[in-house]
């Protein structure tokens, strides 16, 4: 699967980490930061930085809290993002990537440019 990821994207790489190391691996920024470059051909992109920021700001902890339903967790995560003045596209992209990684959805997230194009098309 790791070979396939090099041709794919961040959401698939995050799902690989969850499948190989468990959901709690996403709580460990150092582990994620060490693994992602190998999975993504050493491409540390804007999107990757956004995920690292989400880990640092406690977003993943909120998503993994067993006291929250998936929907409640996403709403609480959005509140944290908004308190940090994170743009809506960044919020949605990161939450969609993490939702895919956690198995909450089977919709793989595209590259950021493709994602933005789909959002713009959907909103028009």
What are these model-derived regions, one by one?
Residues 2-119:
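Charged, amphipathic alpha-helical regulatory modules used
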